[in-house]
């Protein structure tokens, strides 16, 4: 307006003598001023309002209601789309929120997923500038929904807080998207032969409950299933290795059904069982070997140590079985605990054998000493602690070596002779000769060596073979 005012009150117009000219210029000036003010107001509105709002038509709530009413008018939600014409194709997609915990006792696992299904329903096509209708769960029961169910589910819960966690979208071309959030307790049959070094593939199977293959076909929308960050999952004893999906057809008396399956590969973590079972068992076995270094005459000490280690192994075996179902086969942990129990029990039996023969030796030695004393009293010049051995009809005295005699009625050639003075046979000749007094010395070498070899075979066999 500044330039217009300057022009209006310029000396040129003031000197003009024509009132008509002045009036025309005045009206023109006022008209141009109004146009400029309107242009400024429109520029201010463009700064605060999205420019597309001017181009796009405004959609009112009544228009959406009218579209829904027209779609549902005459719509029968009991009939699937394209019934009698072609199968309805259901594209499925799964987003895994979390997996766990895994319950090995009941052989099941818990999974939290968002399950999505997409299909086309020509009855839901509409003409509107709005391409998609975003609806809540109230619309779900008014249109046809696939009767999908999870085949290996023991318990399934839909989430309802704060509202039902369901979503429904309808596109103008008739495409329908239906998603919902589910928490499922699914069966997972665990093969525990290698427990606790076992690996498992837990399936999640779903299919149509009533529509066979010629009515409904399931397809994966994406080649792989998306998952959330596994580090927040409550797997505890297990580690998530990966997953894979597959499609198969099962044959039943009611028809052929398409089954969609997701396999979750899990590997068990050994940390818990190493601390709770393996290390205590190994330490208990090593503790039982302390008995070999205790004097054989310390009966209470060695007996109490052996019984304590046996009872400890029994307790460890019972605790180890509590984390397992009652399977009829032997697991890797059962084998390890059983062998450890055998080693501990063998250490106790070793002292029992040693104590028995040592006591027997002392009794026979005392009897022999009495006989020698009686003979010595009858034979002049014979040392009381010696025996007579006939050589060419000559009796020669020999120091007693406190040996054992073979049991009466036994053949020394065929009996594993553990006695010092086995009279005949190859045992007496020195091929195999075991001294009872040195059983502890033999055990100090045999038990650790045998247990080390067992551990080598056990861990290599289960971890690498």
Curated annotation (Swiss-Prot):
Belongs to the ligand-gated ion channel (TC 1.A.9) family. Gamma-aminobutyric acid receptor (TC 1.A.9.5) subfamily. GABRG1 sub-subfamily. One of its GO terms (biological process) is synaptic transmission, GABAergic. PANTHER family: NEUROTRANSMITTER GATED ION CHANNEL. Gene3D superfamilies: Neurotransmitter-gated ion-channel ligand-binding domain, Neurotransmitter-gated ion-channel transmembrane domain. It comes from Homo sapiens (Human). This is Gamma-aminobutyric acid receptor subunit gamma-1. Disulfide bonds join 188-202. It is found in: Postsynaptic cell membrane; Cell membrane.
